[in-house]
A protein has these predicted regions:
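C-terminal functional modules
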Residues: 63-134
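Catalytic-core regions of glycoside hydrolase
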Residues: 1-61
Length: 134
């Protein structure tokens, strides 16, 4: 039995339960058809202004049917090209070992990309770099 009066509370993006990890994807964890049948959908955001703005922007594109690619969405939001290539590392569905080439790109991002978003993502990028050095 489907109940449309149910509100969905999504903790996918929250960072308080695992402070080393930032989850981010093109809302791959949601079924749009299921979501459309619900009364409300709440996103428990990160508390980081630029990251939350990116998540809300991403959600808007998700609701509109992903009319642009994830890469284009990230470019629109001025993410570093190396970070765009590595964005899959933030999707918890991907349990990947970080390669040497990916770790080199992470180091470049940390050294060369300057953005308010980078300031918020620095601890998560640093954690990925440490994972890649193991």
């Amino acid at each position: 039995m489907e109940n449309s009066n149910i509100a969905v509370w999504d903790n996918y993006f929250t960072v308080d339960s695992c402070p080393e990890v930032l989850n981010y994807s093109y809302f791959d964890h949601l079924d749009i058809q299921y979501l459309k049948k619900k009364e409300m959908y709440f996103i428990n955001l990160t508390g980081m202004a630029y990251t939350d703005n990116l998540i809300i922007n991403t959600f808007g594109h998700f609701l509109n049917g992903k009319t642009i690619s994830f890469e284009e969405l990230l470019k629109e939001n001025k993410l570093d090209k190396n970070l765009i290539e590595l964005i899959h590392l933030f999707n918890p569905k991907n349990k990947l070992k970080i390669t040497d080439a990916e770790n080199t790109k992470i180091k470049k991002i940390l050294e060369e990309w300057f953005s308010p978003l980078k300031n918020e993502w620095y601890p998560y990028l640093h954690y990925l770099k440490k994972r890649g050095e193991k």
